[in-house]
């Protein structure tokens, strides 16, 4: 297994790495056997590595498939890490050329993607609506739960041509 630390080694020495971060490694897209070859090549062309963490599990994370734009359409999403920045790349209908980028941010701690459906989205809205959670639109396909730092998550949901940030776990 190839292991790379994020950023410059001096920034992530044990004394300077945030304690909640855990050990983050990055894998080549080729390490994901279920990922279609055209998407692997597209990720490599963008120089993406897929961030992982050894916290709690050795299971590979941050490559998922689901219906993120239209029910029944198989889309792929991967966390792309480059130069200390991570973002979610969504390959619509499995196409390596029809790609949306969402949630681009500095890598200050690990992130983990999962597929969520209508029930999860509505339950989290109900639990947090008194705290000002955004009311979701009609839910007719899946969303991407973007968890970070083992603290909270945001559901990325495609609606009417743009990404909405809906309430996730807190």
Functional labels for PLM-detected ranges:
Residues 59-66, 76-78:
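N-terminal post-signal-peptidase region of extra-cytosolic proteins
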């Amino acid at each position: 297994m190839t292991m790379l630390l994020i950023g410059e080694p001096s920034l992530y020495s044990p004394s300077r790495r945030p304690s909640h971060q855990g050990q983050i490694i990055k894998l080549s897209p080729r390490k994901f056997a279920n990922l279609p070859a055209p998407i692997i090549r597209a990720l490599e062309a963008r120089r993406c590595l897929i961030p992982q963490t050894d916290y709690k599990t050795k299971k590979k994370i941050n490559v998922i498939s689901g219906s993120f734009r239209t029910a029944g359409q198989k889309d792929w999403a991967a966390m792309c890490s480059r130069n200390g920045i991570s973002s979610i790349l969504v390959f619509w209908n499995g196409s390596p050329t029809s790609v949306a980028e969402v949630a681009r941010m500095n890598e200050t701690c690990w992130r983990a993607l999962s597929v969520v459906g209508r029930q999860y989205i509505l339950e989290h809205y109900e639990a947090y609506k008194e705290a000002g959670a955004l009311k979701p639109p009609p839910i007719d396909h899946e969303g991407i739960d973007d968890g970070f730092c083992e603290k909270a998550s945001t559901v990325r949901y495609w609606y009417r041509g743009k990404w909405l940030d809906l309430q996730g776990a807190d």
